[in-house]
């Protein structure tokens, strides 16, 4: 490929046995057994076990390497013995016998967090040293998953006839659900641009211009208080518009997009509802679940028992009913004659 590597580590397998190659990456960890030194080399795709014995002129220098040193290694691919095969790695059937190496960049002696561990270092440390945090296997998996999902969404929308069109980032303020982030203009003193809370007006201009189906993975900026489940300030949303479409057309596209995406990327132990997804009116949702975003994994439903309290003489209920309130209860399953506590709900 180039002077730094001939292959990505994920592409190294038993087909390359006896071949001499060059690879580059980070030292994930090393193990000195006295007569043998094992190095787990890591790149963005996988790990490769490299080995050198104490008869090699490189042994002493390689014994000094540290985790996260960046290194280029030249050597011969050899087959592992049956008992040392690692079936969890693409390269687990082979190892690289080191013949030469070059340290491309040395790591400091102590790291604020260990890249090769799953220890919880706390959000403050992880965000301060984000470039190290993102090297960790879990975070690498997450950012690759995000990339794969975005590419899948783009492919789905293109197959459905949608065009991906960009909208301006520096724009004028428009009323939305939060406050705007403002950017001062260098040219027009005292004037400000607003970052879009959503591409609403511009996408509608696209539709008025004759675009039939529009979508965008759009950055949105909202100056609002942080929440436990949402990063403050900015987020990305799948934004879409359709011309000459009914509500059923839109629900159909969104349902299939969600189903296909989750069906492809969910873990094996998870399951999702088959299409069509159940639909509820706002009124039905409030009456049956008490909210407009119900968790359908919970089988319990609210029951309207208002009529049983009308004229019952229980003033606390009758006064509320006169003001338009409803009395709801939860019917616990198979609870007759048994004590019930909150833990059962």
Residue ranges and their predicted role:
Residues 1-342:
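Class II aminoacyl-tRNA synthetase catalytic cores and aaRS-like
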């Amino acid at each position: 490929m180039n002077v730094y590597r001939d292959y990505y580590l994920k592409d190294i397998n038993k087909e390359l046995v006896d071949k001499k190659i060059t690879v580059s990456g980070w030292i994930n960890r090393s193990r000195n057994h006295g007569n043998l030194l094992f190095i787990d080399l890591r790149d963005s795709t996988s790990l490769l076990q490299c080995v050198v014995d104490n008869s090699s002129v490189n042994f002493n220098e390689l014994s000094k390497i540290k985790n996260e040193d960046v290194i280029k290694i030249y050597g011969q691919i050899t087959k592992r013995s049956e008992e040392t095969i690692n079936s969890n790695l693409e390269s687990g059937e082979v190892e690289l016998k080191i013949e030469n190496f070059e340290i491309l960049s040395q790591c400091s002696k102590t790291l604020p967090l260990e890249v090769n561990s799953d220890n919880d270092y706390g959000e403050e440390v992880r965000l301060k040293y984000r470039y190290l945090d993102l090297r960790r296997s879990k975070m690498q998996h997450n950012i690759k998953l995000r990339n794969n999902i975005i590419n899948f969404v783009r492919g789905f929308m293109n197959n459905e006839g949608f065009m991906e069109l960009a909208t301006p980032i520096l724009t004028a303020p428009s009323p939305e659900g939060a406050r705007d982030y403002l950017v001062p203009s260098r040219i027009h003193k005292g004037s400000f641009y607003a970052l879009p809370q959503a591409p609403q007006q511009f996408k509608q201009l696209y539709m008025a211009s004759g675009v039939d189906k529009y979508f965008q993975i759009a950055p949105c900026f909202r100056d609002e208080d942080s929440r436990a489940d949402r990063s403050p300030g900015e987020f990305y949303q799948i934004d879409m518009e359709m011309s000459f479409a009914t509500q059923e057309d839109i629900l159909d596209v969104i349902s299939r997009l969600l189903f296909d995406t989750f069906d492809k990327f969910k873990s094996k132990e998870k399951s999702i509802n088959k299409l069509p997804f159940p639909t509820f009116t706002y009124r039905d949702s409030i009456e049956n679940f008490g909210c407009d975003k119900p968790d359908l994994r919970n089988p319990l439903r609210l029951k309207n028992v208002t009529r049983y309290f009308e004229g019952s003489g229980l003033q606390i209920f009758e006064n509320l009913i006169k003001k338009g309130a409803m009395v709801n209860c939860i019917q616990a399953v198979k609870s007759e004659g048994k004590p019930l506590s909150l833990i059962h709900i």
